């Protein structure tokens, strides 16, 4: 019986890996699978060696670093001495997974990387580790394939998993009715992020901007997408200070808001790509710790951070970062989207091109077949 071990580090990787497992079981039901993962993989019947919930941290913190080193050694020992897989599938989470690959590549089993590190964005030298330690790379962006091929790395573009995961666009009137929104008003939805430090750094900025937007455009309403990782006690006191805006705080309604809003205020991340797939106009605004931004500026390889802009290699979506993340700039850019039809239509058309460029069906199916054929 063949054995596969999967390693993810946060929710998105867990979700993408679970989709692959679901397809693998159709092709190769006898395959024995264990993982470092979360609820999504567990729900597919995968035995978890450990839960990854404590791994998804950002920042330079010795406690985090030491815990990752210890966990990496523990996983490596388990793979070498106990589970002995035929293949290890690394999924996203480059900082941890690439370092682990340096150790486990010496053990003789195949190592495939699904959703590899974004070396085109920063720390391009990491491609040397990929070249040395990874047997095959499965990319989700078309431009990555050419980049890896130039380095002589075995690579295949499988498509972006979001294309299969994202629901069809819902009926806007139904969304408004079910969530207590006014059909006669424009909707601006706020996505302040899924991490505590993002809420602390961004939410007040976004709400102050919303207040300015409301003053200049009274026929606007606001909704806030609360991530499942953010507790009510963090959000509620902040929202209460903006009671004049009558903001609808919604949980588990991300796709409905992304699809039905007239404009979006987003923290940078995958949510921007999800919004692009719904062709919804947006701005990106992000402000993090100054020292982390300085480090990022030193190691970055590209000038853009928003995925739709990176994919098309042009400035489609406004990026308001660090010193440009101001109330004036956030509010004025949203007002321009709401009130300038020509600009709005231009952005919508550009977002359609993003969707077209990623269009290839069945990332999970393709990944599963490649694994099954090569394990």
List the predicted regions and their residue ranges.
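Nucleotide-activated sugar donor-binding and catalytic core shared by glycosyltransferases
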Residues: 1-375
